[in-house]
UniProtKB/Swiss-Prot annotation:
Pfam families: LpxC
Pathway: Glycolipid biosynthesis; lipid IV(A) biosynthesis; lipid IV(A) from (3R)-3-hydroxytetradecanoyl-[acyl-carrier-protein] and UDP-N-acetyl-alpha-D-glucosamine: step 2/6
Enzyme Commission number(s) from the entry: 3.5.1.108
InterPro entries given in the database record: Ribosomal_Su5_D2-typ_SF, UDP-acyl_GlcNac_deAcase, UDP-acyl_GlcNac_deAcase_C, UDP-acyl_N-AcGlcN_deAcase_N
Top-level enzyme category: hydrolase
Name this protein carries in UniProt: UDP-3-O-acyl-N-acetylglucosamine deacetylase
Active-site residues annotated for this sequence: H259 (proton donor)
HAMAP family registered for this protein in UniProt: LpxC
Amino acid sequence: MKQLTLAKTVKGVGIGLHKGEPIEITLEPLEANSGIVFFRSDLNASYKASPENVINTQMATVLGDDRGFISTIEHLMSAINAYGIDNVRIVLNANEAPVMDGSSISFCMMLDEAGVKELDAPKKIMVIKKPVEVRDGNKFVRLTPTKEPRINYTIKFDNAVIGEQSYNFEFSKKNYIENIARARTFGFLKDVQALRSMNLALGGSLENTIVVDENRILNPEGLRFKDEFVRHKILDAIGDLTLLGYRVFGDYISYAGSHHLNHLLTKEVLKDKDAYEIVSLEKTTQKAYEKVFA
């Protein structure tokens, strides 16, 4: 099984969730073993997508250094993971990726337009060899060894609309597109004023966010799935785990997880060399793992 990049360059435009300004995005092919690289054209600055380059996880996953930052990368990273793309350059002319409709389906459409190209290098995956867990009170995220990688996610909100929701996701591109990619980000009406006073969520609207009041959803079209909230959390988690640089072959289990806990989990994994193995998918090894790329 070979590494993949894009067959051609594709461009798009969307609104930034936090600044509320139009953002141009370009996805470009990259050579083998390059990974996922973000480039801010307005700063002439590149940022490799990796845990060590994460500088903030408060409202989104943010890459950066003393030159600047790129925020809200997780939805795009999630789509890239689902499509099995190993090497891509993402060019942005602003400090965040566009939010599009609040899900990753627009990025999936861009990747469909670009197509994929095999490179002359074997695909590599990260196989989890022993359990790794991060906790914050009763909240936790965990990776464990498995023969069939999946995500088991539970959320619990003190809100009548959301309440407690659980979802089990088995990795495949088809399953992702049908059941995860269209799940939108969400927020609470009571938090809007505070966020905007911090210059956050300035681009948030009913066009790109599920807005929840005490006992109702403000979006006139309603939900895309009855459990859209937890499905979106899975979308986010896939994007955050992609920062490890490989498709992760392990069970991810979360209770009330977050970008912050996901980031701590990726750091914990990398800290313990016995917790994982990087497997090169040559002809002799790929059969055991190829289902996850179907």
